[in-house]
Amino acid sequence: MQTTKFFMIGMPGSGKTTYLAMLSNVLVDGNSDTKLYKKVEDMPEGYEYFSDFGKLLLECKELGRTRRLVYNKLRISLWDALENEYLLDVPDISGEVFRDLVKDRQITQEIVDRIRESDCLLFFINYKNMSWEYRIPLPKEITDKKNIDAKKKEILDSNLADKREANQSEIVELLQTILDLKLNRPYIRFVLSAWDKVEAEKGKDILPSKFVEGMFPLLYQFVETNSKYFKAEYWGVSAQGGDFQNPEDVKRIEEEEYNAIKVIEPTGKQSSDLTALLYLG
């Protein structure tokens, strides 16, 4: 059996729970065409928790944020077309935990262990739930890690005490902290949530990497500068399929059901398969 462990990272409101809840729906329903599937007799561990959120999503209702002290995980054996087995073990941790990691440099040993044991880090970002301060022009002369760190610290020190949404400098700070905890060269998939809204603003042909380059220049430059230290990919995901505040979107989602889901791979290939994000083959 091939054991694949993921760890999900993201500030509050970045889309982690929405992804896991809709993934649970898709796996249990079993009628969607996916790269990975569960056997009929297997039920995901933790499904009881995520099913409540899943029902809300199917009713086109927004989810609340994960409570800080609540620690849940989705654990299930999945299979690919060649009958290779993958043990999916993904914890759902409140975004406030990661905010505290940036602000106070505090984190539990259990989370440190999970980060180090992971085969792939899923780093969730929802640009709609970020402060406008993150849109900071990056001077051309900022090209090496030392200068990026200095610029990032300057911005971070002036903003971190606030209780508003995360900004770009905090995202970079979180990424660097996570990298410092890993003991080997990590594999990171940046998951850009609410991709339906990205396409509505930027057009359907935009690649996830180009969106990050234009919207998050500080993050993009950090990733490019440090590419020898970790492997990175950019994915676009709309797990709920649209804007629940938009009546036209709600009508479309109700008609299309799981087909409303959008998953955009780094190459631009589009599907409605949430398991594609978990497939490392």
Predicted features by range, described:
Residues 65-122, 128-137:
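Switch II of P-loop NTPase G domains
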Residues 32, 102-103, 200:
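Short, flexible helix-adjacent loops and helix caps
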Residues 21-27, 95, 107-108, 138-143:
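Amphipathic alpha-helical scaffolding segments
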Residues 5-13, 84, 101-112, 161-168, ...:
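Short, charged/polar micro-motifs that form catalytic or ligand-binding hotspots
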Residues 57-77, 159-175:
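Alpha-helix-centered segments that form part of catalytic cores
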Residues 112-114, 120-281:
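Conserved GTP-binding G-domain of TRAFAC-class P-loop NTPases and closely related GTPase folds
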Residues 2-3, 13, 84-85, 116-118, ...:
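Short, well-ordered loop/turn elements at secondary-structure boundaries
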Residues 1-69, 79-88:
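Conserved G1/Walker A P-loop phosphate-binding module
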